[in-house]
């Protein structure tokens, strides 16, 4: 099983120390309720090699071995990593193996990065972090510590697999909880929430929860689905959106800015809008599930298969 004690030691003398009042008990309870496959995934981590390597997090997530693996060793590594499929967010380049994930998350990072306050020496929270691709890119920008939260057990095991192949780097940590389970720490310099808001039944509550994790003057980076329209326009899908059952509210950019200001954020601005393309989200050898092309109207890719506007994402920056 995955040991969280090193993380407790890390935060004991940090601005996150108050989290130790609740977190250890929460994670003990979490371990009792884990998915049936979790033990199998966690045990697989023991089979991964940990070899001397050069780590590059500056422009990708890469671990280059001093001495390359043999063909047989590479085949075994691929076999172990594919036990953790589907790999959704990446890509990763590890020990000569290219994990070509469903999402080219580097595309999103390239859109977001130019607009951020410098991440160097910052304490960062990444909400809904998935397997942690963007967390490693934040570390590459010089963050002091990045904490990701995501309750999905597979993502935790994928993250720990990548960490092991990155020289067991402790500057990033994934905690398998949701934002609603976190006490208000008001301790993070930057909080990211990317690809989460539209899954929330109460989006304003989610924005308030993000605000409660930021220091005064801290920065929120919010990325979410949007539609065209004015301050009054919000899409509430009748049933599914792009075959997703758990999509509740997709606002226009002006409506989203209004929500953020309503919960108390300042200096709210939209810095990027991008339609999701099949270059950014597509099927690969590391994903057997359906992907973007399966979610769109086959006759008109400007619409989802249900007839709604096709996915478009906006990046919003705001100050606490």
From Swiss-Prot:
This is tRNA U34 carboxymethyltransferase. Catalyzes carboxymethyl transfer from carboxy-S-adenosyl-L-methionine (Cx-SAM) to 5-hydroxyuridine (ho5U) to form 5-carboxymethoxyuridine (cmo5U) at position 34 in tRNAs. Its EC number is 2.5.1.-. One of its GO terms (biological process) is tRNA wobble uridine modification. The keyword Transport does not apply. It catalyses: carboxy-S-adenosyl-L-methionine + 5-hydroxyuridine(34) in tRNA = 5-carboxymethoxyuridine(34) in tRNA + S-adenosyl-L-homocysteine + H(+). It comes from Glaesserella parasuis serovar 5 (strain SH0165). Homotetramer. It is an enzyme of class 2 (transferase). Keywords: Transferase, tRNA processing. Carboxy-S-adenosyl-L-methionine binds at residues 89, 103, 108, 128, 150-152, 179-180, 194, 198, 313. The gene is cmoB.
